[in-house]
Amino acid sequence: MGYVSGILLVLIGLLAGVGLGVLLRQYWLEKRNRQLQEQARNILTDARKEAETIKKEAILQAKDSLFQMKAEFERETKESRKEFQNLEKRILQKEENLDKKSEALDKREGVIGKREKVLQQQEKELEENTRELHMLIEEQRKKLESLSGISAQQAKEMLARAIENEARHDAALMVKKIETEARETADRKAKNIISLAIQRYAGDYVAEKTVSVVNLPNEEMKGRIIGREGRNIRAIEASTGVDLIIDDTPEAVILSGFNPVRREVARVSLERLISDGRIHPARIEEIVEKVNIEIENAIKESGEQAAFDVGVHGIHPELIKLLGKLKYRTSYAQNVLQHSREVAFLCGIMAAELGINEKQAKRAGLLHDIGKAIDHEMEGPHATLGADLTRRYGEAPPIIHAIAAHHEDVPAEDVLAILVQAADALSGARPGARKELLETYVKRLEDLERIAGSFPGINKAYAIQAGRELRIIVESGQVNDADVVLLSRDIAKKIEGELTYPGQIKVTVIRETRAVEYAK
């Protein structure tokens, strides 16, 4: 019984505890709910206040913007009204001016109408006077024909011939005067530019010969070079493409060939074979192959070095190789690569003085003789070949034209072509730059004197200054002072058309009048 009572008490205590807990939880929940409702009301109140504030600010901003827009609109309206008023004033002024001009035009029309009537009357009178004048002229012409015994047509022809002769004389005098003035000015400026170019460029130069002789240590070496039954000499000629001539010349053999590069390969190969001592077909082919590679590399290096020295970049590799080949080519004993380098420097200096593209001038000068690298392989003038080459490898049109025109195969169309012509002549004409064979030199002198003697009125002609000047003495009775200018020009043009020569030739025509009287 006591045990049951204890359990009941425990259960009652538990139930009482649970009930008390439920009541306490209910109380806490209600309190928490009231707190949350209070927070919600506070948040709602704050939000309403903030919304009211934002609304007021927006209204104020809208009013302010409206006020500014209204003020801007009023200002623009005033400006537009003012512009319209000014425009209206200008229109009124123009209308007044137009009215005045209209009145002036009406007055002018009246005056012009009166003048037109007067002119018509004068025109009628002029026609009548012209008819009368023609009649008088016809009468006078008939009288003159009857008195002079010649017709009007014959008189016209005589007058025309007289006027033509007088015009020729005046034209010759005028040409002489203009040429004298132009030459004085041009010579002065050209001399300044050329002298400056020569002063600024002072390149060293040694005249080269087309050497094709290989020295031997002794006469026995000739037999070794020939080989058994001539097999060595045949191997050398087959490998190099050059003729090997062995004659009575002591301790020397001669290499003959049109291609200067092949001749250089043969010379170097033969010298190495002689130095090595082993001369047989297999060794010859081996040495020639090695020398070919070395010469090709040397050619490329020479072309690159020339372009670098001049300061020209971006040249096509094939043009560089052809440029290097010019090292083994000579013209009148002048090395063509050195000549091209010299022309490039002179072109650049003169271009700088004239204010044109200096780099383009140097490029044209360096490449102007590029055609000489292949003129022994292809037919045609080297200037034309060079122009075709540079066109093929993408050079600029002014460069191509300057190359084509540097020997006047085509007319020069720009200053660059003239510069290349001048620099080419300057490089080739300076003393010691070029040499020529005695036979060629003598024939050129004879041709100069022959050309001068082919013109009428020539008394004597002398080629002097090593063929760089042609001095001509004319008959004073057949050639007058005015004709001397035209004669010198005609002779110079004929020389240009018929002869080939380095540099330029000065043509001097001398006319002398002597009056002799004896005192008795």
Swiss-Prot record:
Give TM regions.
4-24
Q: Name one GO cellular component term.
A: plasma membrane
Cellular localization per UniProt: Cell membrane
**Positions of the KH domain:** 210-270
Q: Where is the HD domain?
A: 336-429
Claim: Membrane is one of the keywords in the record: yes
Q: GO BP, one example?
A: mRNA catabolic process
Give the Pfam families listed for this entry.
HD, KH_1, RNase_Y_N
Q: State its Enzyme Commission number(s).
A: 3.1.-.-
Q: Which CDD domains match?
A: HDc, KH-I_RNaseY
Record's protein name: Ribonuclease Y
Question: What organism does this protein naturally occur in?
Answer: Syntrophobacter fumaroxidans (strain DSM 10017 / MPOB)
What gene is behind this protein? rny
